[in-house]
């Protein structure tokens, strides 16, 4: 297998042009006027509904913004179990793609050029390849708007996850939920903003299936 590092610096490979790019979505998130306590009955019912969604898929766009670069790509997230899930990033401008595949042996990151890296230490691999520690195991829950049971998070008056923070390897990720799909139960996120210092990930989910 070929060795490669910091794949996501290949922003031109995954860049999406056009006014519909997730990069144009709003980033500023206002604090909710009313914060619902974690033991609220409706919120607890919402959490139970989210917990029942154990196998699902989501498609949309993901954007990356830093002082050095900004790009966006399509994403296809397929989640089956905590040790069986995958994320594919692709562009409608080329046939190139980037895949992250989780199995019982750890995480494999590969691209359409034949480059591949695998490691049991997933956090270290994400740091090596992407340049930032990102808890990919937690992403399955973040995407659904399902916080850690004893985590530091805020619930809005619609009984939706509004914000939370997550510490990993001395770094802090702050998540803000800007919009939800409210035409189905349970309400699932439509636009999420993840921030880690000067780096921002904007995730827009266009399709949910479970």
From Swiss-Prot:
Which positions carry the signal peptide feature in this UniProt record? 1-18
Subcellular location(s) of the protein: Cell outer membrane
Per its UniProt entry, which superkingdom is the organism in? Bacteria
Keywords in alphabetical order, please: Cell outer membrane, Chaperone, Lipoprotein, Membrane, Palmitate, Protein transport, Signal, Transport
Q: Name one GO cellular component term.
A: cell outer membrane
Its membrane topology? Lipid-anchor
Spell out the CDD domains in the cross-references: LolB
Give the lipid-moiety residues, type S-diacylglycerol cysteine: 19
Task: Mention one GO biological process in which this protein takes part, according to its record.
Answer: lipoprotein localization to outer membrane
* Principal location: membrane
Covalent lipidation (N-palmitoyl cysteine), chain numbering: 19
What InterPro entries does its record include? LolA/LolB/LppX (IPR029046), OM_lipoprot_LolB (IPR004565)
Q: How does it assemble?
A: Monomer.
| Function as written in the Swiss-Prot or TrEMBL entry | Plays a critical role in the incorporation of lipoproteins in the outer membrane after they are released by the LolA protein.
**Family (UniProt):** Belongs to the LolB family.
Write the protein's name. Answer: Outer-membrane lipoprotein LolB
User: What organism does this protein naturally occur in?
Assistant: Actinobacillus pleuropneumoniae serotype 3 (strain JL03)
| Gene that this polypeptide is encoded by | lolB
């Amino acid at each position: 297998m070929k060795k490669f590092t910091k794949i996501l610096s290949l922003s031109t490979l995954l860049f999406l042009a056009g006014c519909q790019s997730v990069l144009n979505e709003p980033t500023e998130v206002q604090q909710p006027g009313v914060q619902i306590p974690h033991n609220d009955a409706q919120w607890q019912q919402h959490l139970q509904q989210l917990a029942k969604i154990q196998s699902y898929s989501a498609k949309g766009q993901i954007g990356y913004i830093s002082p050095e670069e900004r790009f966006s790509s399509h994403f296809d997230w397929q989640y089956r179990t905590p040790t069986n899930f995958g994320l594919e990033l692709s562009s409608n401008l080329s046939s190139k793609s980037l895949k992250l595949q989780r199995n019982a042996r750890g995480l494999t990151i590969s691209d359409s050029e034949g480059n591949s890296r695998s490691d049991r230490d997933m956090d270290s691999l994400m740091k090596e390849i992407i340049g930032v520690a990102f808890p990919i195991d937690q992403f399955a829950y973040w995407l659904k708007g399902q916080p850690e049971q004893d985590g530091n998070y805020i619930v809005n008056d619609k009984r939706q996850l509004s914000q939370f923070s997550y510490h990993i390897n001395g770094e802090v990720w702050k998540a803000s939920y800007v919009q939800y799909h409210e035409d189905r139960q349970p309400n699932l996120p439509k636009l999420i903003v993840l921030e880690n210092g000067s780096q921002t990930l904007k995730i827009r989910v266009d399709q949910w299936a479970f």
